Amino acid sequence: MLEDKNQSRTSLAELGEFGLINHITKHFKVSHKTTVKAVGDDAAVLERSENQTLITTDLLIEGVHFDLSYMPLKHLGYKAVVVNLSDVFAMNGVAEQITVSIAVSNRFPLEAIEELYAGIQLACETYTVDLIGGDTTSSTKGILISVTAVGKAPKEEIVYRNGAKETDLIVVSGDLGAAYLGLQVLEREKQVFKVNPKNQPDLDNYTYLIERQLKPEARKDIPVLLKEMDVHPTSMIDISDGLSSEIMHICSQSEVGCKIYEDKIPLDPQVISACEEFDIDSTMVALSGGEDYELLFTVPIADFEKVKGNPHLSIIGHITNQSAGLNLVTRAGQELELKAQGWNALENKQ
């Protein structure tokens, strides 16, 4: 979009900061009674009563977290919201409001920012959250997006990472590894395009993988499902950095160990096929790929009958004594130490 010479471009400088804010937020609607004042004043006003407030923030930077050569701006806006909402759902909460702050260089016209906010608005409508504020400023290079999500939950229903107990079952929603493989496909096609710009990629066999990378969904449905099943998790976390990294967070904060069974890890057929094509071990992709935004949680073993067989959930292991360590039980029955090899936000990737 940014390179389309035939498309009309409106400089952001023509609108100014407040003109831009008014322009990109005028179609956003308020859905929650707790939103007393959204965009348009010095601060948003929220009304809180019997619930506790959940707050989470994520920062996305061009060249570090996303590549606009294959990430459409509308998808970027959607994803920026979703990754924050996922954290609220991982606390067993309900997301209600977001703020969005952006820093953009002068290479982005108004039309590009409209695309970005179209994705943000779609996410707000899909997950029923209100945009209540944020900030805009200039950037010397690229685009930066910071989203803060605000949610709520009754005190007794909030689920932390530190509540896992010995013998608890380890459960994960959905399937793992697709987002990482979607990224590998997109990066491969980017390199092919550099060599031959006329080449049109055939991505029909990778639609699920690419969608999981470019337009992930937060599992708002899982806390609802668990409540319907009368299951209260003892600990929970969303899978942003990879299964191994996340279970290690739970075990560290809960002061327990774990056993994950390789043959129980849920994998989509496209993941298995793509792993064979790329000559990558599918288990390592699930353990270390990240960006799945599924929910990983523990439940008392007494809830086994409630959880087993549910098409949205997989029991992949159990919690052990801390002295037993953190282990992966392979299909051959061998026990291997789990290691965190997922995304490190502070690692220099260059």
Language model: regions and residue ranges:
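Extreme N-terminal cap/leader segments of soluble proteins
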Residues: 1-72, 100, 348-350
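Glycine-/charge-enriched secondary-structure boundary and capping motifs
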Residues: 2-19, 23-29, 107-130, 140-145, ...
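Short Gly/Pro-enriched turn/cap motifs at secondary-structure boundaries
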Residues: 33-37, 215, 285-288
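Glycine-rich anion/phosphate-binding loops
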Residues: 37, 69-85, 107-118
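Glycine-rich anion-binding loops of enzyme active sites
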Residues: 47, 60, 96-189, 318
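Short, compositionally biased
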Residues: 182-199, 203
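Polyanion-binding loop/helix "lid" in catalytic or ligand-binding cores
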Residues: 200-249
